[in-house]
């Protein structure tokens, strides 16, 4: 029997939610009731699969903590009042911390003036953010398209490359094995994981995947395309594969890919949605090799963990294909004043506090500690790797990785696996994480591994 719409039920539910939003604290009974509600609503109205995932990485087989508020720049508090050190960082959105006061203030000030743009008049913050990114990004990157997420940023990059290269008879893209570029149809065509791709086949034609970090395979793909008349329009790469398991290519790989693109007249698209905004110890990971892309994709941390925003930045030569008709690719909420205010404040904080350099220093401290633990527990840990504050601990199998995440949850540290590689646990904290908290994270990791070792020995 079909359920009839109920305005009264919707009104009551929305009023209840607004009441919760207004509250700063909850008593014990309110906390218990909220937990039950959230679990029930996820099961009945969001997706029950999320509950099973949360259950697999939390302590005691619970469905996990119900998030309530930020505790500090570097911590989260659940409805039970438990404070967790955030080493997941919302998959890389909290580079400047949770509720950074500079970012929050900028958004609040803009909210008091004009939350969204008229679509017809020129909006100043979009112009100022585009100018700021032109100054901040490497090489000849100059023009920006703004959107709301990483996958939208990649979609824009692919369409821009198509519009530029189609008149030149070039239609094929090279992506890499293990890549993750998003889950909308175009971005998914560049993404490599079969689990995400197979249900939506056939995807967009014209995408080849070659092994990541293998410059010979990349060179062969270019040469074969030239021989067969199926010439390469663009290469799309992550400088470090995030969801693939924090996979670093050999030093010089990006430089060699840039040379191939120049030799064969292809565009280089760098997806820095996860590696950008100071995460790896430079503002952009491509700066470790002084590589200058033709198109750069940003999102996640660009909004300071306060507003969603993505950006696709391109050279004037490439972006000029949109000059005659700027409506060829647009989005209603892209570049809205609130999101641009957040992005401008985020860039200001990153530069004023020199957070990329801090990421390099504190990342070295954490990575050294994780590598020491890998040496101490070789039967559990295969490898620790990373750059800056983008790190991963790879375990011997998926089950061991899940167990580590659960044990860290007991230690009040949030971590999780990567989307393409379940046995790899990412460590991606805010760049504002203090040295004291870095030491606490390492202590918690040691305690977690020790508990896991005891369980192994008891079997």
From Swiss-Prot:
Which co-factors does it depend on? pyridoxal 5'-phosphate
Q: What is its EC number?
A: 2.6.1.82, 2.6.1.29
The reply on keyword Nucleus is no
The entry lists its GO molecular-function terms as:
diamine transaminase activity; identical protein binding; putrescine--2-oxoglutarate transaminase activity; pyridoxal phosphate binding
Q: Which domain of life is it from?
A: Bacteria
* Alphabetized CDD domains for the sequence: OAT_like
Which top class of enzyme applies to this chain?
A: transferase
Q: According to the UniProt record, list the residues that bear N6-(pyridoxal phosphate)lysine.
A: 300
- For this chain's UniProt record, which GO biological process terms are given? L-lysine catabolic process; putrescine catabolic process
- What are the protein's UniProt keywords? Aminotransferase, Pyridoxal phosphate, Transferase
Tell me what reaction this enzyme catalyses: an alkane-alpha,omega-diamine + 2-oxoglutarate = an omega-aminoaldehyde + L-glutamate; putrescine + 2-oxoglutarate = 1-pyrroline + L-glutamate + H2O; cadaverine + 2-oxoglutarate = 5-aminopentanal + L-glutamate
- Residue positions annotated to bind pyridoxal 5'-phosphate are 150-151, 274, 332
- Would I find Transferase among this entry's keywords? yes
The record's section on Pfam families has:
Aminotran_3 (PF00202)
Involved pathway(s): Amine and polyamine degradation; putrescine degradation; 4-aminobutanal from putrescine (transaminase route): step 1/1
The similarity comment for this entry is:
Belongs to the class-III pyridoxal-phosphate-dependent aminotransferase family. Putrescine aminotransferase subfamily.
Record's function text: Catalyzes the aminotransferase reaction from putrescine to 2-oxoglutarate, leading to glutamate and 4-aminobutanal, which spontaneously cyclizes to form 1-pyrroline. This is the first step in one of two pathways for putrescine degradation, where putrescine is converted into 4-aminobutanoate (gamma-aminobutyrate or GABA) via 4-aminobutanal. Also functions as a cadaverine transaminase in a a L-lysine degradation pathway to succinate that proceeds via cadaverine, glutarate and L-2-hydroxyglutarate.
**HAMAP family given in the database record:** Putres_aminotrans_3 (MF_01276)
Name recorded for this polypeptide = Putrescine aminotransferase
Organism expressing this protein natively: Salmonella heidelberg (strain SL476)
The top of its lineage is: Bacteria, Pseudomonadati, Pseudomonadota, Gammaproteobacteria, Enterobacterales
